[in-house]
């Protein structure tokens, strides 16, 4: 059996340059998510720049050098399109890379249903196992959906990719693959853990006071989640669960401290459930072949109705600004694109529907730009800012000054709650603006 698989493997083995010849002018090419993004293939495709026109590339958090974007800054030959802008994507956004709006849990559905069909799909993965399966490693997000719908399927094997157990839709059989590239086995991209600032530590402290034994926690990336992870690790909390889109080093801290058991989870008991991982090499070593973790496609991890089934769910995310109505922007500064909707709205909605669920969106009360300090809590969002979470979805907002609960609150109550956690230097100004907007009563208080 294995000998037959090896023969099939050899018959499909090609160089990156040979694989890149599958791309034709006008094609749509899609790369795997994050650390699964094609690297050797993209480098080979860049060499064909002068042979090709109007090749569109879809990616999601491209973790590696974008060779095709670098050789074609005017996007005459290659145009990048990203489901979420981060990592190397940020170098090209608003130049020759464009954003694809989405709710993250709908990504596989959009791939199967509404996207212009992919002509060539390329995913970086593990080596083939004895059963003929390639594991998607650090990301199961929409890999199966990509491969199901593509005209040509290509795997780029990297022997340094962690093998991440399922779950569901975490691997692909050789029979479903057209070509295989043996990569140069470059190190998997890592991201450092941001050291939390005093403000982020203060926000984390407010959240920690709301946690209790048995909570199931979803964390985003950044200083506040890292601070929460450190505080949980040092606390007496126990039997915590994990159900998240992104598995980050903060979870590793909690796991090493023995805080995570998943014993009280309503579903996927004892399993740490995630869709993709990005972090340190130590994190990748931890998730490698670890039966305590389960990798799923994002239409499971981020489905609000799945999240809602998990009692005592806690979602912790961050944003750029919020207005007095409770509209949250987490993806742009005015019209300048920064990141994307990602899974924030998925978890905001899912966590609230969970029994005893809590959703926290964190932001420092102020920001300093070119020497000028301004409030991140604004009367209205900056013109052009994208609404990530509508006011109807926002549950709780967190700054270093406290927590504002918005669900079930009228417009004047929301204004009062938000101004209470604004920086004191801006509270009077916000009250005046709220009065102009007719969302302030004379009896409102901010003390």
From Swiss-Prot:
Pfam families: AcetylCoA_hyd_C (PF13336), AcetylCoA_hydro (PF02550). One of its GO terms (molecular function) is acetate CoA-transferase activity. This is Probable butyrate:acetyl-CoA coenzyme A-transferase. Keywords: Cytoplasm, Fatty acid metabolism, Lipid metabolism, Transferase. Transmembrane segments: none annotated. Coenzyme A-transferase that converts butyrate to butyryl-CoA. Involved in the syntrophic growth of S.wolfei on butyrate in cooperation with methanogens or an appropriate hydrogen-scavenging bacterium, as part of the butyrate oxidation pathway. Induction: Expressed during syntrophic growth with butyrate (at protein level). Seems to be constitutively expressed. Belongs to the acetyl-CoA hydrolase/transferase family. One of its GO terms (biological process) is butyrate metabolic process. Pathway: Lipid metabolism; butanoate metabolism. The active site is at residue 245. Its EC number is 2.8.3.-. The lineage of its organism: Bacteria, Bacillati, Bacillota, Clostridia, Eubacteriales. One of its GO terms (cellular component) is cytoplasm. It is found in: Cytoplasm. It is an enzyme of class 2 (transferase). The keyword Aminoacyl-tRNA synthetase does not apply. CoA binds at residues 220-224, 320, 343. It catalyses: butanoate + acetyl-CoA = butanoyl-CoA + acetate. It comes from Syntrophomonas wolfei subsp. wolfei (strain DSM 2245B / Goettingen). It comes from the Bacteria.
